[in-house]
């Protein structure tokens, strides 16, 4: 398998081709961590869909939760007060009007389900929102462990706990997302995180959909676990790994289900060196190496047109020209999400 490298704007693009099955359908994704600006107003749909439509043809947009301030971590409790029954990161009353507006413009929509942090709606003894509702499993209250007593020599100063200090101040720590709005994560072994995506899909009735588990859920969470309980036409997910640079060659995706989803995607959480993007068996890792006809993306999925382009990168960050140039390179080479070719960007 030949792996040509293209240099563009200080970045390297890895292209791994395989058979085509569907016509190209680029996707524009509304960022799930949008700042509290006009990303969710209907006026944005009216004013900007014409900018995207000529550039990307039959664009498909994903919707996203209500705005959350980046300095406040996950969605704060007052944000979810509009509809506790349907809100889960994002809620139906926010999502459906946007989708209807896009449908009125002839634009297809995918619901973007991002499992990030659980909303901590209960305070601990310090007055910090870091206790989860009982229905999500045991509450995570920081500090989790008391300081161990040690025999100290006379005059030896007592050591303090770094975790306790950072949690008390509201800064980022194991169970805190900053600004005193801590939202401890739930482990992937719990049944609630694995059951949430299909429940959200059924309640909003918006197939197809995409689920992106937070890395802290662990590698036990798989797309097949969600797909087995849904009937959507397209199901994608991510298989997260750890570490800043994966030094070892990536391995194939574990075959944890006898009936895999119709369309899946795997992507590492951190960067993989270009020369290591080939498994021990000589094939590409993950879903592409295992079942190419069922894969929709490979390594990365934003700002490459494969298949997502982030809304905030395109409009808010002023990267419209750079992203369009990158997409034009892919279009000239006939590289599209449905063509099954992958694109991986790393700084040169």
From Swiss-Prot:
On whether Coiled coil is a keyword of this UniProt record, the answer is no
- Tissue specificity, please? In callus, weakly expressed.
Which residues participate in substrate binding?
87-88, 182-187, 214, 283, 289-291, 302, 344
Q: Could you tell me where the Low complexity compositional bias lies?
A: 161-188, 223-266
Q: Can you state which reaction this protein catalyses?
A: Endohydrolysis of (1->4)-alpha-D-glucosidic linkages in polysaccharides containing three or more (1->4)-alpha-linked D-glucose units
Comp. bias intervals (Basic residues)? 145-160
**Which cofactor is essential here?**
Ca(2+)
* Swiss-Prot/TrEMBL site (Transition state stabilizer) positions: 303
- Could you give the cofactor binding note from the entry? Binds 3 Ca(2+) ions per subunit.
EC annotation from Swiss-Prot or TrEMBL: 3.2.1.1
Q: Which SUPFAM superfamilies match?
A: (Trans)glycosidases
Region annotation (Disordered) maps to: 126-266
- Could you say which residues bind Ca(2+) here? 116, 188
Sorted keywords for this record are: Calcium, Carbohydrate metabolism, Glycosidase, Hydrolase, Metal-binding
Magnesium as a keyword?
no
Q: What class of enzyme is it?
A: hydrolase
According to the UniProt entry, which residue ranges have a biased composition of type Polar residues? 189-207
Listed under GO biological process in this entry are: sucrose catabolic process
Show the GO MF annotations: alpha-amylase activity; metal ion binding
Q: What does this protein do?
A: Important for breakdown of endosperm starch during germination.
Q: Cite the record's note on assembly.
A: Monomer.
Say which family it is in: Belongs to the glycosyl hydrolase 13 family.
Q: What is the protein's name according to its record?
A: Alpha-amylase isozyme C
Gene name per UniProt: AMY1B
């Amino acid at each position: 398998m030949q792996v040509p490298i293209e240099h563009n704007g200080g970045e390297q693009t890895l292209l791994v081709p395989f058979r085509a099955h569907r016509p190209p359908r680029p996707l524009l994704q509304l960022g799930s961590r949008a700042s509290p600006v006009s990303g969710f107003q209907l006026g944005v749909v009216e004013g900007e869909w014409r900018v995207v439509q000529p550039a990307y043809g039959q664009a498909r947009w994903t919707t996203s939760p209500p705005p959350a301030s980046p300095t406040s971590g996950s969605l704060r409790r007052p944000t979810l007060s509009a509809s506790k029954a349907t809100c889960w990161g994002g809620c139906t009353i926010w999502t459906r009007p946007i989708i209807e507006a896009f449908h009125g413009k002839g634009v297809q929509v995918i619901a973007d389900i991002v499992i990030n942090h659980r909303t901590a709606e209960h305070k601990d003894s310090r007055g910090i929102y870091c206790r989860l509702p009982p229905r999500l499993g045991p509450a995570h209250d920081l500090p989790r462990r008391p300081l161990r007593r040690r025999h100290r020599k006379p005059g030896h100063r007592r050591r303090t706990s770094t975790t306790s200090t950072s949690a008390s101040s509201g800064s980022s720590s194991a169970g805190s997302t900053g600004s005193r709005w801590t939202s401890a994560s739930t482990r992937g072994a719990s049944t609630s995180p694995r059951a949430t995506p299909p429940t959200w899909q059924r309640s909003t009735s918006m197939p197809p959909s995409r689920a992106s588990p937070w890395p802290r859920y662990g590698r036990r969470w798989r797309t097949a676990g969600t797909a087995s309980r849904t009937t959507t036409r397209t199901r994608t997910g991510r298989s997260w790994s750890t570490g800043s640079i994966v030094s070892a060659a990536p391995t194939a995706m574990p075959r944890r289900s006898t009936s895999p989803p119709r369309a899946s995607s795997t992507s590492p959480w951190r960067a993989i060196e270009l020369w290591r993007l080939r498994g021990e068996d000589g094939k590409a890792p993950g879903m592409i190496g295992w079942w190419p006809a069922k894969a929709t993306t490979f390594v990365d999925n934003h700002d490459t047109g494969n298949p997502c382009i982030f809304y905030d990168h395109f409009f808010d960050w002023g990267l419209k020209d750079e992203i369009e140039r990158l997409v034009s390179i892919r279009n000239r080479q006939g590289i599209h999400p449905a063509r099954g070719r992958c694109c991986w960007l790393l700084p040169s």
